């Protein structure tokens, strides 16, 4: 190997100054949160009683992906903890990604582990190995021992396998599970219709307040990216780069998460090309990469047959154009072909219909019902909302 150590590594990043400002997990300060003053104020009002040691309202937050729901919930919760401390109230918040912790046991374990300090409580919260009821009992003990108020953020709440944890958390005080701690829940969902699936008892206790976060417009997206532009070194961004990224993201339902991803990927593409500037032309390439990563994350954990159904729709879309979608029978025919190619037994038509409904719920596809008259009867068309090339590429690389 001919490279010296000095040749092998770059000691100074020529593009990024503070790259973490462009990471989705980064929680920015108030000055970097753009276009959500009203939503932050509404959330703060809902949980305001907590700073005095009283029960915060339970809140359900709706909005499309990338509209700032998680960001604002975390920001308000962090500020609540700080302000409550100034008032002599011991508070904290726990965050659960329900797309990862989909079961009741996983979610309650994450909450208990997040709020625990074993040196103080002498309560152990193992990753696994306890019953759900034991995790709950330990959680209630921790809350009463350590805190006056706790807020639990359940992100992507619609990914939970059932409503049981919502019932337990929203009624913990009423049921006498905790006596010295007040507990509030902030549920976050991309699906406005999610509430329709809830148990009526959960709905009555969890949905005390409801807020809808609208999509960002192009100007707001531009401001969001400009507020994080110091992630880059001075002078590396071409003047047209941020406006172009904002325009592309605005076209995709005002998704700020995607806008930030596009900007970060454009910088990485500049790095890999050896460019000293982040050019507008890199933004288009970055959008494709962001779209691919977003879809990959969307189908993470899905079953092989769930993927075969999507693959069938991608095949139809690429062969025939999107049209107005494709009938269930046609999708099923291509799905069966894919199953044969994969050496897998196909599921029943009824089960494939269920999988298509699940994809529609996740906004991966759109379903529309049609009447074919007395000769054909009614039928359902299914249309991909994702780029079929992206769907094909992601499903092919994972097969």
Residue ranges and their predicted role:
Residues 1-57:
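A short, basic N-terminal segment
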Residues 3-5, 14, 102-112, 117-168, ...:
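Mid-core helix/loop region of P-loop NTP-binding domains shared across ATPases and GTPases
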Residues 44, 306-314, 332:
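Hydrophobic residues on short alpha-helical segments
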Residues 55-75:
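Walker A/P-loop nucleotide-binding motif
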Residues 60, 235, 244-305, 320-324, ...:
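C-terminal helical "lid" subdomain and adjoining coupling/linker elements of P-loop NTPases
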Residues 77, 166, 353-357:
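Short, hydrophobic-biased segments on the C-terminal half of alpha helices
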Residues 82-113:
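AAA+/P-loop NTPase substrate/partner-engagement loops
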Residues 323-399:
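Terminal-proximal interaction/regulatory segments of ATP-powered molecular machines
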């Amino acid at each position: 190997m001919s490279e010296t150590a000095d040749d092998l590594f770059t000691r100074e990043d020529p593009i990024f100054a503070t790259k973490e400002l462009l990471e989705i997990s980064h929680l920015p300060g108030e000055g970097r949160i753009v276009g959500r003053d009203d939503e932050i104020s509404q959330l703060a009002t809902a949980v305001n009683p907590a700073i005095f040691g009283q029960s915060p309202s339970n809140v359900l937050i709706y909005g499309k992906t990338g509209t700032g729901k998680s960001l604002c919930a975390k920001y308000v919760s962090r500020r609540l903890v700080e302000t409550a401390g100034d008032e002599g109230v011991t508070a904290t918040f726990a965050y659960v990604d329900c797309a990862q912790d989909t079961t009741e046991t996983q979610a309650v374990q994450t909450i208990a582990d997040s709020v625990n300090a074993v040196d103080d409580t002498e309560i152990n919260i193992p990753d696994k190995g306890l019953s759900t009821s034991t995790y709950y009992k330990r959680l209630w003990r921790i809350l009463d021992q350590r805190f006056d108020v706790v807020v639990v953020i359940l992100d992507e709440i619609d990914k939970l396998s059932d409503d049981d944890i919502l019932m337990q958390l929203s009624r913990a005080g009423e049921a006498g599970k905790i006596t010295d701690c007040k507990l509030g829940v902030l549920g976050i969902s991309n699906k406005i219709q999610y509430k329709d699936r809830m148990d009526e008892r959960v709905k009555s206790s969890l949905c005390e307040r409801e807020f809808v976060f609208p999509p960002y417009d192009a100007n707001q997206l531009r401001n969001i990216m400009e507020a994080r532009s110091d992630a880059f070194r001075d002078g590396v961004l071409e003047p047209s780069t941020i406006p172009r990224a904002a325009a592309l993201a605005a076209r995709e339902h005002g998704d700020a998460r995607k806008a930030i991803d596009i900007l970060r990927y454009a910088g990485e593409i500049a790095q890999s090309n050896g460019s000293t500037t982040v050019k507008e032309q890199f933004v288009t390439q970055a959008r494709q990469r962001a779209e691919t990563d977003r879809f990959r994350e969307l189908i993470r954990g899905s079953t092989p047959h769930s993927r075969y159904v999507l693959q069938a729709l991608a095949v139809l879309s690429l062969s025939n154009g999107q049209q107005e979608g494709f009938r269930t029978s046609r999708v099923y025919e291509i799905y069966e072909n894919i199953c044969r190619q994969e050496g897998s037994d196909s599921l029943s038509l009824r089960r494939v219909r269920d999988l298509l409904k699940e994809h529609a719920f996740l906004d991966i596809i759109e379903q529309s019902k049609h009447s074919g008259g007395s000769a054909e009867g009614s039928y359902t068309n299914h249309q991909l909302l994702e780029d079929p090339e992206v769907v094909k590429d992601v499903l092919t690389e994972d097969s």
